[in-house]
Amino acid sequence: MNFQFYFLIKHNFISCKLETPLQLLLTTYVNLLKHKKNIIPLNVDKARDVYRAHENSYFLDHYIRSNQATCITQRPSVKLGEWVQKGDFLCDTTASSAGELALGKNILVAYMPWHGYNFEDAILVNETLIIYDIYTSLHLEKFEIEIENTNWGPEIIKLSDWMFSDKRDSLYGKELFTQETTKQTYVKEKQITIGVLKQAFLRRKGKLLINRRFISKIHKYEFLTNQRFVVPQFRYQQTLFQQINKNPKKQLISRSIIENSNQLSIYNKPKIRFTNNVISSKLFKPLIIFSQVTLLNILSQCHIDKSQYQPTSELLSSKLVAKEQIHELLFKQPKKTGVKIKLKHGTSHTTDFYNKDLLSNTKMRAGGENHRPGESKIYLGSKASVKFINMNFQEKKTNGYKKISLYNNKTSSQNNVNKKSFFLFLNKSILFLNKPRPKYKSTRPVNVSLNKSAFIYRRSFRTLFPYNFKNMRLSCEKLFVNNNNWLINYIKSLDVVIGGEIYRPGNKLQINLEYLNFKYGFVQKNNYDHLDNDGIIKLGTWVKPGDIIVSKLRPIGPHNPTPLEKLVAAILKKKFDDYKNAAFYTPKDVYGRIVGIEILEPKNLPSDVEYSGIGRVEFYLVDKRRIFVGDKMAGRHGNKGIISNILPKQDMPYLPDGTPVDMVLNPLGVPSRMNVGQVFETLLGLAGKYLHQHFKVTPFDEVYGPEASRSLVYSKLYEARLKTDQNWIFDPKSPGKTRIFDGQTGANFDQAVTAGYAYMLKLIHLVDHKIHARSTGPYALVTQQPVRGRSRAGGQRLGEMEFWALEAFGASYNLQEMMTIKSDDILGRTQVFDSILNSKPIQNSHPESFRVFINELRSLGVNFQSQILHQYNPNIKTKI
């Protein structure tokens, strides 16, 4: 809201009216000019007409951004009908009060040590300063997005129909299916079935990676109503989990990280029943939905080529997800065989998944080549041995997570039965399989490589490969055996096999697979809902790092598509896009609300060029920041410090009258720095608090007499003592000091403490602008050493004196790491992760700076040859 001043001039007197639209409606008659000799009652309209020529208007600024990205706001300091004259101030700004400079606040401070929290000028703060927003500041950030000219034309700001269709909400459980006819083939606009991913937005470190639709073609299906199934709610969080890829460098970082999965919701949606009795991989290519560590699995059955393989194991994947209780997600087919699922908090449900034709041709045999005692092999035959598997889920408390006990029931009379493998995914990302045979149980950890399939080869089966190529593969980090249960910990990424072939040339097994990899989780639906139809963020939207501000598209011109792009284009029946995504994202460590948007027209564009009508977009984002541990504060005497801790009000030291201290300062910061003025300020502020007086002390007041400052302070303290009848304000035995009580114990401290009101300021050096951490990051091009600075994600850099310290301590291994693999050893920093993961010794290498030094000598004409001697055999030499 803009405030406007109206000044009406009459006989050198100026009267002002602070006018807002609300006041114009409520105030119809106001006496603007009143004086002893000139009393002229006027209403607003008449005053404007009579004194139109002498009217001056001033508009106040609100939420203006300063050069330091702080907020400047002007507020009126005059009232309606008040007389003003030349030189009187009309309004205050953010940094003024009653026309005087005011950058801080008067708060109660005490100079005393407190459990070491004010070591080295650190500051202890009361939480009331945060609760009442005493030092809360507003920060305005400005972002500019320019429209650039490329060789293929100008960029455009818009929502692409290819990436952001109006029906994108159907992804998230709102409109998965249509029911136009009872039977229909695949329709492009209505393109999702259970387990088929419609559209995947993948994000890493705030950058949009892929905007493509992956659709599986279903030949024939029909719709049934009133079927309940689970649909994930996509909630994006910028965590380290989304930043992990197949690079072995990131494996060590993610060792101890186990992300909780996203919650699941239940919707009533139509059920799909396939017209085919067998859901084979030829007709159904399941693309699995994977959100962080939550896997929404689907029903899948193997398609086996009998001419090439005899030993086989049917992999049956049940779709079970646990939230607080385990909900079913199932298909139903009219068959006698099936799986009985007993829920702890519900009734039993029987699901019929089995391929009747396949089971009828399966029987168990023992013996044969490479047979172990007690091991069963599956061969294709004429008889079948069918069983019911009763999975009773019982919740147990083990190591803080839910544990599922899985056992078999209602088996046939035969000893050797056809066992199936079940994959159960809980909300703690724990995967359990059937128990292996007791004779072959193991307790040692088993390492699984990232690219190895997560379908476990049980010893009871002679399995060459998970034959369902069209199914999914899981990439995991750690596989171990616990209580005879296979357990996969921390599911890391998901590979979806979309094609492939398998054949056996001679006695060797050759497998060619083509798969998609989803590594980083999915972006939430709201990331695009806050954009308007033009692709620009809406005013008033709250944003966080990584959110899209402007959806900008950049022309890319002709290019050679990759095989994956050709596959996606063939599935979607789309032509290759002429634009690529160049969206602008909220920068790192930026939180706040969009409070201003300015759209400027483009310049210097040819008239025949089509553009979106936008040349530059400017955004203003406001952020409210309270004081926090690590922020810098200071007084008016150079007494600066960092906030070390924020204590509750009841734990802070308090005065004899029960007033808790707002801030505790280090008393050692006074004598050595010769700024005793802060002590006088504190005591005089205490006297002024109870006397309700405001003091202006002349600098160098000793010219008026010896010890003028001391005399003024003591006299005012004594006056305050007499006025309030509180003797602790001034004690003649220890003037300027008082007894302080401990807020935690209630006992008073042994020594008297200097306490009073001082003027403390919050500096612009905030911890949000300073804090920085890096594991691995960019390296300089020439020296190959970590770059410097927080803005460039710089790393740790050790200088000559730091190396001296390590040498003095004899930390040889740390010294080697700092000088080589953590600095500029290109080969060593790549091999060290492999050495740690595989429990191999770290090889010694040489830094890149040594190679640069040798090349500089050679550039000067000095031929310098160097060799590395072997650690144990000096005759073995290696050239550098």
Swiss-Prot record:
**Known catalysed reaction(s)?**
RNA(n) + a ribonucleoside 5'-triphosphate = RNA(n+1) + diphosphate
List the subcellular locations. Plastid, Chloroplast
Q: Which InterPro entries match?
A: DNA-dir_RNA_pol_su2, DNA-dir_RNAP_su2_dom, DNA-dir_RNAP_su2_hyb_sf, RNA_pol_bsu_CS, RNA_pol_Rpb2_7, RNA_pol_RPB2_OB-fold
Molecular-function annotations in GO = DNA binding; DNA-directed RNA polymerase activity; ribonucleoside binding
* GO cellular component terms given for this protein: chloroplast; DNA-directed RNA polymerase complex; mitochondrion
* Family membership: Belongs to the RNA polymerase beta chain family.
The job of this chain, per UniProt, is described as:
DNA-dependent RNA polymerase catalyzes the transcription of DNA into RNA using the four ribonucleoside triphosphates as substrates.
* Miscellaneous note of the record: In L.terrestris the gene for this protein is split in two.
Read off the PANTHER family from this record.
DNA-DIRECTED RNA POLYMERASE I SUBUNIT 2
How would you summarize the oligomeric state and partners of this protein? In plastids the minimal PEP RNA polymerase catalytic core is composed of four subunits: alpha, beta, beta', and beta''. When a (nuclear-encoded) sigma factor is associated with the core the holoenzyme is formed, which can initiate transcription.
What protein name does the entry list? DNA-directed RNA polymerase subunit beta C-terminal section
Organism listed in the record: Pleurastrum terricola
Gene of this entry: rpoB2
